[in-house]
Amino acid sequence: MLVLGIESTAHTFGVGIAKDQPPYILANERDAFVPKEGGMKPGDLLKHHAEASGTILRRALEKANISINDINYIAVALGPGIGPALRVGATLARALSLKYNKKLVPVNHSIGHIEIGYLTTEAKDPLILYLSGGNTIITTFYKGRFRIFGETLDIALGNMMDVFVREVNLAPPYIINGKHAIDICSEKGSKLLKLPYVVKGQDMSFSGLLTAALRLVGKEKLEDICYSIREIAFDMLLEATERALALTSKKELMIVGGVAASVSLRKKLEELGKEWDVQIKIVPPEFAGDNGAMIAYAGMLAASKGVFIDVDKSYIRPRWRVDEVDIPWRN
């Protein structure tokens, strides 16, 4: 089975190709929109994805050394994400499905991150941290679905860091040589400032931390503010994670999503693993951020259990939660 996956939920347009036997991932091509200033504007994302889609599709097929006719199914991330960006990927997927008579596989973007994590880390039954620009979730698989034990009550961890560095003119770009701008700034900081620390059960709140940190700009060294906001945010995340580990008694902790690429977070998680005698499984950097390969792979799993959708019912779902998705391929 060969599945072509299309990712366009936010700033990245990606096309991946997966098959149902090793090496599983045959291609993983993408192009990310980087704003010249400010944040991501939906109209700019739509334009970027529309312009990049043909080139990225062609590159993926060339990388896998196949033609579109060799593909069995077309998988597409229908959500969650930014509406105009999602529509580009969905439109391309529908067009390919109709033109080449290929069944369409609906994929939840978050499930894509989780499933590529299972594949690349070889985790068996983990507690899962899904950390990205749009999501901060603590989850695990139980009785047919991924059940959420904790999540952000407002903005996501990645979004909080992005907004801060943008507001203080450290970004864009947000990622420089594989490091987030807040990590680079934090390297010269050492003073831990007093900022809000909000953990409620296994849920977290980052909006107050962001607001308070911005109010300190001009009053404290920027490097110390960056250091403090990062350390406090990560410590909040680790406390909520420890509570979930105590509740579930899991012996594996899998981390997926773009924030998983943070070196400083990885070090904290490794320390947590030693303290709790838990194996830490972190998705490789090349699969941490948004990519088409994870959509293709999750689509392959879904297709193996007959999960398809009619083209005329393939609506985008910008607020599609991970715990709303049935997972028939997992026991």
UniProtKB/Swiss-Prot annotation:
Binding positions (Fe cation): H109, H113, Y130, D290
One Pfam entry name: TsaD
InterPro entries (UniProt xref): ATPase_NBD, Gcp-like_dom, KAE1/TsaD, Kae1_archaea_euk
Positions of substrate binding: Y130, L131, S132, G133, G134, D162, D183, S262
Catalytic activity from the UniProt record: L-threonylcarbamoyladenylate + adenosine(37) in tRNA = N(6)-L-threonylcarbamoyladenosine(37) in tRNA + AMP + H(+)
GO biological process: one example: tRNA threonylcarbamoyladenosine modification
KW Iron (keyword) present: yes
Cofactor(s) recorded in Swiss-Prot or TrEMBL: Fe(2+)
EC number: 2.3.1.234
Function summary: Required for the formation of a threonylcarbamoyl group on adenosine at position 37 (t(6)A37) in tRNAs that read codons beginning with adenine. Is probably involved in the transfer of the threonylcarbamoyl moiety of threonylcarbamoyl-AMP (TC-AMP) to the N6 group of A37.
NCBIfam families the record matches: arch_KAE1, gcp_kae1
Protein name: tRNA N6-adenosine threonylcarbamoyltransferase
Source organism (scientific name): Saccharolobus islandicus (strain Y.N.15.51 / Yellowstone #2) (Sulfolobus islandicus)
